[in-house]
């Protein structure tokens, strides 16, 4: 049995340089680094994310918690209280995710900017990527609807039957039944995502409302209600995911409750809702926030073929 890491010394040194550059970038901008708990009593209600369950003892009594899938919930409690820009670099966990771009445990950079619009945050992201890449970087902006144009379909106007026909025409034989967003996710991941950001880093904007999660909603240029969020793609890899942050506790609770109803229909575990976050939500200042995969950023910068080379020891070898 080999004890050696999956990452070479040179790759580890490159990773260390990226982490140093990120911290220096935020120090220069006056953004405060914070640390929040990895273990939480509440879980992620998102139906596409599996939380890692943790069993422990609290004051001598057995308890069940979850390793966080993102520091978002706890960071927003700090944001609501302190009302200052904050960032965090930490390990996060998502169960049942393993592949060339996935590891169950990975490193996330997350930051929140009070009184920043999504455009402001996109510009700061561009500056950070330029620093990490050590060269000026420009972004291309592409709407979610326009990303489907090469397939000859419109995600908001066309029917599920049109989506199904498109999938079959491209030899994708999976049945998402009557799940409209499921069909769109299938087509996007198989036929659109692999080519995004191949020539220039691409911001995909105006996602369907069904993908809003913790983002606000607005009407796009065609009048469709969409999520105020964007994702950054480089070389066909999703690098970052940003929201114009929802600051409405009642709406957030309704979304979490709806998620759990979907989880029940799908036979997934019902997740405890983070009531601390709900209580803090109304006090969050107008802001935008973003999560960035550090391991994936290292992959695209150093042209690594697998996330294995961006992480010293992967979960299956830990």
Predicted regions: what they are:
Residues 1-2, 6, 18-22, 224-250:
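Polybasic, low-complexity association/targeting segments
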Residues 131-235, 258-284:
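Metal-assisted phosphate- and nucleotidyl-transfer catalytic regions
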Residues 122-132:
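Short amphipathic C-terminal alpha-helix that caps PH/PH-like domains
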């Amino acid at each position: 049995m080999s004890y050696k890491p999956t990452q070479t010394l040179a790759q580890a040194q490159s990773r260390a340089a990226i982490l140093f550059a990120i911290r220096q970038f935020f120090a220069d901008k006056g953004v405060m680094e914070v640390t929040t708990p990895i273990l939480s009593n509440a879980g992620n209600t998102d139906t596409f994310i599996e939380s890692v369950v943790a069993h422990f003892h609290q004051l001598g009594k057995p308890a069940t918690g979850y390793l966080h899938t993102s520091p978002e919930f706890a960071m927003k409690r700090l944001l609501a209280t302190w009302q200052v820009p904050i960032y965090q670099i930490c390990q996060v966990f998502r169960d049942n995710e393993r592949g060339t771009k996935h590891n169950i445990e990975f490193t996330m950079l997350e930051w929140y900017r009070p009184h920043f619009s999504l455009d402001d945050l996109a510009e700061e992201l561009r500056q950070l990527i330029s620093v990490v890449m050590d060269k000026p970087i420009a972004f291309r902006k592409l709407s979610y609807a326009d990303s489907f144009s090469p397939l000859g379909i419109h995600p908001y106007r066309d029917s599920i039957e049109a989506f199904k026909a498109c999938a079959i025409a491209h030899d994708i034989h999976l049945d998402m039944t009557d799940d409209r967003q499921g069909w769109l996710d299938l087509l996007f991941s198989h036929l659109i995502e692999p080519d995004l950001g191949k020539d220039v880093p691409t911001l995909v904007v105006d996602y369907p409302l069904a993908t809003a999660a913790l983002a606000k909603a607005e009407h796009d240029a065609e009048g469709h209600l969409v999520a105020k969020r964007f994702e950054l793609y480089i070389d066909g890899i999703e690098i970052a995911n940003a929201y114009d942050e929802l600051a409405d506790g009642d709406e957030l609770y309704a979304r979490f409750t709806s998620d759990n109803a979907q989880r029940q229909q799908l036979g997934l575990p019902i997740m405890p809702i983070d009531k601390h976050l709900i209580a803090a939500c109304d006090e969050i200042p107008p802001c935008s926030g973003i999560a960035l995969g550090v391991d994936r950023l290292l992959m695209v910068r150093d042209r690594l073929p697998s996330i294995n080379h961006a992480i010293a020891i992967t979960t299956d070898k830990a």
